[in-house]
Amino acid sequence: MTAPKSTAPASTAATFRAIPVDDLSPAEAASEHKALAQEITGHDAAYYREDAPVVSDAEYDALRHRYEAIEERFPGLRGEDSLSEKVGAAPSEKFGKVAHKVPMLSLANCFSDEEVVEFVARVKRFLNLGPDDEVAFTCEPKIDGLSCSLHYENGRLTVAATRGDGSQGEDVTQNVRTIADIPERLAGKGVPQTIDVRGEVYMAKADFEALNARQAAAEEKVFANPRNAAAGSLRQLDSSITASRPLKFFAYAWGEASDLPAETQFGVVEAFARWGFTTNPLMVVAKDAAGLIAHYRSIEAQRALLGYDIDGVVYKVNSLELQRRLGFVSRSPRWAIAHKFPAEQATTVLEDIEIQVGRTGALTPVAKLTPVTVGGVVVSSATLHNEDEIARKDVRIGDTVVVQRAGDVIPQVVRVIEEKRPAGSKPYEFPTHCPACGSHAVREVDTKSGKVDAVRRCTGGLICPAQMVERLRHFVSRNAFDIEGLGEKQVRAFYEWGLIASPADIFTLETRNARSLQRLENRDGWGKTSAANLFAAIAERRTVAVDRFVFALGIRHVGETNAKRLMRHYGTVEALEAGALAAVIPGEEHPKGNEAWQEMIGIDGIGDVVAEAVIEFFGEPRNREVVTALLKEVTPEPMEQVAAASPVSGKTVVFTGSLEKMTRDEAKAMAERLGAKVAGSVSAKTNLVVAGPGAGSKLEKAQALGVQVITEDEWFELVG
């Protein structure tokens, strides 16, 4: 199964992700990718191990969809531990573990007729078949239960296991033996010597209602839905409890098998029925996408009358030979897909539109709703995506709206019921100032393409409380002010204690602490020595390289490299600020091209996007106040000038392996001071590779490309 039905009125999955994946910066993508991984892992554990899911099927699918879309857009985030390569959750320690010789994979999902047509076309393309060539598919209901694998040796049930993480499941053999639908011995012809029969343990709706009535009468826990009841019943340590629960089983797949009784999916499932299993009577064979969709509609129409929960229809290539040719991709087979039913919708009143400010300054509109139940979950908030979506749908406060829990971001406002709009309502005006700090909020424009960013962002990064902890954490980070002993944990605590609210506060902390009634050394986790060490570390950073100073300000799009480029040109923070202010055109939200603007974009490597971000930053008066206050406490050191006559000036250099005479940061600084560009990877554009002991793939690639390779000693000889 892919996801649970919710048992809670709210969940972390309702965190609204309104920024389209294509608009995420690499840093934003990495941060969200990590957060999504943690969230999905938690939901997997709740669903597969604890039988206590807290998000709906649609919510979970949307989280997975977002996670995979980020990996597709930013392939570098897909590591060996990516959730894209995993299924389910690790088995519980309460049960013995069973290894699946053939992994129990999940299925890819689709939600529209167009996606079904594309699935069929994709299968044919992979098989080098023409559009008119015929491929048969099976169609069957997608049961909302708990996946289980039953291992038979010489026709006898020997081991039963849950899906677990797909590679290893929980041993539930004794509990499975109590389910009447699961034969202890396989009867009939064609039973192989060994076979794993796979299917779904579920509970019929009538049995679920009767069980809950008994539970309530005995003043015991009642279950939220049939799926939870089935999973909780199967995963009992006492098999007598499982025996008392009305569990059922549909057989529909297999894993390891010494032989198979047929060459088609449908034929093998027919054999399951002959051997004593219950199979789904609604399974049919279709020969094209139109047939698949027609059967989907038929099952959807019968859904309420089936007597058990389903959440879609599964399509599988019928020929086992074609299945073998198609193979697998990531965590699912190419030859199968689950066509999910649309999420349920409900109508309610939009009471207000709240603007939330994210840690990067993004303004996200959230609809505050009269609470309404959608698919068994109480919804009181929904995303409105961004101001363009609000305008496109003409969403207004007081409107009656349709809310849905499905799609890219959920829950969401689908549409307005205009005939119920109250008299005198006015179009919503999206704020142009941050509700958290009052700073100007802007939408970036690519001056070359004219494309306007969908997201409006606060420009008051250094004074905005919604962004402050993240901004302060960045300010003290290693490549910025690099203050030892002042990490994210300490920054967050100091901010919550009211000790630090802006960068300049860091440098007045010791003075203020001496006058405070509650000194730092008397707070939990601190003492005289640790406080003294922190104050000493802060004092050491009262002088800092000017490019580090600018990088530490956290100006959007200004990383270490761009900070260096800007400060090599402007020299001082004051000159950079003056240049930015000179480029501001009164009454215009975006620069149009005066001399100051042309000067900034004329800097090598500084384009329109970076220049506009710098101008917007210094265009906010309170940002300038913060910078002025900081300059009273800190002295930025001028950048060392590039050596124009250096033998490596203008060349791209890569350092690899262990450096023995300098750190990697020192090597980078030296090379840049000599006018070189330092890259992190080797390419055809690389001019020189400096290789120390232990150099690996970068050295090999350099040799393959014919790039000059030298040792660390030869580097010092070269640059003098």
Curated annotation (Swiss-Prot):
Zn(2+) binds at residues 434, 437, 458, 464. Keywords: DNA damage, DNA repair, DNA replication, Ligase, Magnesium, Manganese, Metal-binding, NAD, Zinc. It catalyses: NAD(+) + (deoxyribonucleotide)n-3'-hydroxyl + 5'-phospho-(deoxyribonucleotide)m = (deoxyribonucleotide)n+m + AMP + beta-nicotinamide D-nucleotide. One of its GO terms (biological process) is DNA replication. The active site is at residue 142. It is an enzyme of class 6 (ligase). GO terms for molecular function: DNA ligase (NAD+) activity; metal ion binding. The keyword Ligase applies. Residues 643-720 form the BRCT domain. Its cofactor is Mg(2+); Mn(2+). It comes from the Bacteria. Its EC number is 6.5.1.2. InterPro entries: BRCT_dom, BRCT_dom_sf, DisA/LigA_HHH, DNA_ligase, DNA_ligase_AS, DNA_ligase_CS, DNAligase_adenylation, DNAligase_N. Belongs to the NAD-dependent DNA ligase family. LigA subfamily. NCBIfam families: dnlj, PRK07956.1. HAMAP family: DNA_ligase_A (MF_01588). This is DNA ligase. It comes from Xanthobacter autotrophicus (strain ATCC BAA-1158 / Py2). The gene is ligA.
